[in-house]
Amino acid sequence: MMSKISTQGIQLLFMLLLARYISPTDFGTIGVLTVFITISNVLIDSGMSASLIKEKDITSDDCSSLFTFNISISILLYCLIYACSPFIEGYFQIETLSRVCKLIAIPIIVNAISIVPKTLLVKALKFNAIFWVQFISQLLSCVITGICVVIYEWRLDALILYYNLAAIFPSIGYVLWMKYIPQFKIKKQSIRKLFGFGIFNTLSNIVDTIYENILSIFIGKYLNVTQVGYYSQAKRLEEVPSRSITDLICGTSFPLLCTNNEDTGWYIRKITQIQHVLYSIMIPAMMLIMIYAKDIISLVLGDNWVQAGPYLVLLAFAGIWVIIENTNRTFIKSLGRADIMLWTSIIKRTLGIIIIVFSLLVSSAYLLYAYIIASIIAALINAYALSRLLPYSLMQQLKLWSQSLVPACFFYIVCAVLYNSIDTYFVLLPLTGIVGILYIITLPLFGVTDIRQLLKEFLLMAKSAKKC
């Protein structure tokens, strides 16, 4: 888990540095294509790598069949994207998008090569090997791309180069580390065995992937590609806390929840504690991002990106509900109900798309507000689904949310008043810190008791993550 966060941190830092050299338009050009590449990568795997990990006895035929299947699907998908690239360019009306599409899709095939050797490393619990392959690959990709940006003044082509190198280097690393020699053969029995497990999870991931990237498509179509660039970088910044910390806590708590999910009383107490830890930290953090959005953009990306500020404000507010939604999704997954995950994803994303499309019919200016409404509804749907699996009613969950949301709202109001009243950061930041301490002290008044125990649990989770 920590290796994943470390490599993602390098990628994030590098992308933020690139933003000082590369225009929002170039980032937006890549952003509108993200959905096609991400969906392709989900389809290539089809959940079968998880099956390879799950199976106790695997044969060389299983590995060869999976490798051949992945390569075949990846080539098919690349050819499909290659053929559709002129139509994609016509839809978005972005010059040279067809060429970019053909080049940025190359990692689809490259990533397919690495699935089997990487899965074998995971199955062998060689997490240190995975970390070093990813870490070194990211460093090499960043250094080579950085040289091309600074010395040769590459811009859009530098982004294309980076995404290709970030796929090529790990694939080479996994193959060399495992000394994996692929065989091009396929056995129906192996495919049938591997394909059965994880199909619900895969379909759910596809639905979520389409939805998570659909805003880039709509913004690129109904606004312009520059706005996609602003949106994509704001989204990248918003996901630093909302995704990374949430993934850390949920990822480390998931195995624990799986071990004793039949003891309903213990399970409900544990998920209540996890939510108190996560929400008490993350909700005020997202509200601080809302307040300091413009300053964060200027500091991290530069003044050329200041128009990304309003995107960051709205995405940070939506991020609060995404955190709640993803937490409940982890709980449903830990109960072994991948079928429920699929159906809730279909319902949530269908409603979300309807709301977003309706907002476009009114005005494209309401696009992100529609996304916020859809995020709140999605969180409520996941909460309702969890209430059907456990004696843990929707009202009980809403009460738990309010125990963090209400004090966080007071925290937001006070910090916002301070921000708008004080001009110097030397006074503003210490006062904000004092307000944060008061927020923690007052949490027991709202039902979040034993703060020290909650922080202790959080530290234990972080230590567990380091072992991964």
What spans do the regions from the language model cover?
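Signature of the first transmembrane helix
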Residues: M1-M48, I73-F87, S137-C142, G146, ...
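Transmembrane helical elements of multi-pass membrane transporters/channels
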Residues: M2-Q11, S137, L159-Y174, Q189-T259, ...
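Membrane-interface junctions at transmembrane-helix termini in multi-pass inner-membrane proteins
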Residues: S51-S60, V110-V133, I147, M178, ...
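Alpha-helical transmembrane segments of multi-pass membrane transport and lipid-handling proteins
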Residues: T68-Q93, V143-I147, I271-I323, I353-L361, ...
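Hydrophobic alpha-helical transmembrane segments
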Residues: S98, K102-A105, W132-K179, F197, ...
